[in-house]
UniProtKB/Swiss-Prot annotation:
<feature type="compositionally biased region" description="Polar residues">
    <location>
        <begin position="1"/>
        <end position="10"/>
    </location>
</feature>
<comment type="function">
    <text>Involved in nucleolar integrity and required for processing of the pre-rRNA for the 60S ribosome subunit.</text>
</comment>
<dbReference type="GO" id="GO:0005730">
    <property type="term" value="C:nucleolus"/>
</dbReference>
<feature type="region of interest" description="Disordered">
    <location>
        <begin position="1"/>
        <end position="46"/>
    </location>
</feature>
<dbReference type="Pfam" id="PF03879">
    <property type="entry name" value="Cgr1"/>
</dbReference>
<protein>
    <recommendedName>
        <fullName>rRNA-processing protein CGR1</fullName>
    </recommendedName>
</protein>
<keyword id="KW-0690">Ribosome biogenesis</keyword>
<keyword id="KW-0698">rRNA processing</keyword>
<dbReference type="GO" id="GO:0006364">
    <property type="term" value="P:rRNA processing"/>
</dbReference>
<dbReference type="InterPro" id="IPR005579">
    <property type="entry name" value="Cgr1-like"/>
</dbReference>
<feature type="region of interest" description="Disordered">
    <location>
        <begin position="60"/>
        <end position="119"/>
    </location>
</feature>
<feature type="compositionally biased region" description="Basic and acidic residues">
    <location>
        <begin position="60"/>
        <end position="98"/>
    </location>
</feature>
<feature type="compositionally biased region" description="Basic residues">
    <location>
        <begin position="99"/>
        <end position="119"/>
    </location>
</feature>
<feature type="coiled-coil region">
    <location>
        <begin position="49"/>
        <end position="106"/>
    </location>
</feature>
<keyword id="KW-0539">Nucleus</keyword>
<comment type="similarity">
    <text>Belongs to the CGR1 family.</text>
</comment>
<keyword id="KW-0175">Coiled coil</keyword>
Length: 119
């Protein structure tokens, strides 16, 4: 009797959960596991650090875009000024063909005064 008591007292090895036959008959497929999204795995500190880094990156990108746009606007303005100067020169040359040289000079001075007053 003591032999049977000793066998009953020893704990059985941990019962492994054995998977039986699959109900749908597709035994060649790997068994499915519970869906665990990765969104909950990051800590709050890590997410806040990533947000801070993203804010810095966005600010740097915005600054670079503004610099690029400013450079483009400066080039456009220079081209416009150059064209305006060229048009004005051509206009004075046309006037010089028709009028006396001194009169054209007087008109130039008069127009420059008007530009300064109007602007």
């Amino acid at each position: 009797m003591s032999d049977t008591e000793n066998t009953n007292l020893t704990p059985a090895p941990a019962a492994e959960k054995t998977l039986g036959m699959r109900k749908n008959g597709k035994q060649w497929h790997a068994p499915k596991k519970a869906f665990r999204p990765t969104s909950g795995l990051k800590s709050y500190e890590k997410r806040s650090q990533e947000r801070a880094i993203m804010i810095q990156v966005k600010a740097k990108e915005k600054e670079m875009k503004e610099e690029k746009e400013e450079e483009r606007q400066r080039k456009v303005q220079a081209i416009k000024e150059k064209r305006a100067k060229k048009e004005e020169k051509e206009r004075y040359e046309k006037m010089a063909e028709k009028m006396h040289k001194k009169r054209v000079e007087r008109l130039k001075r008069k127009e420059k005064r008007n530009k300064l007053i109007n602007s």
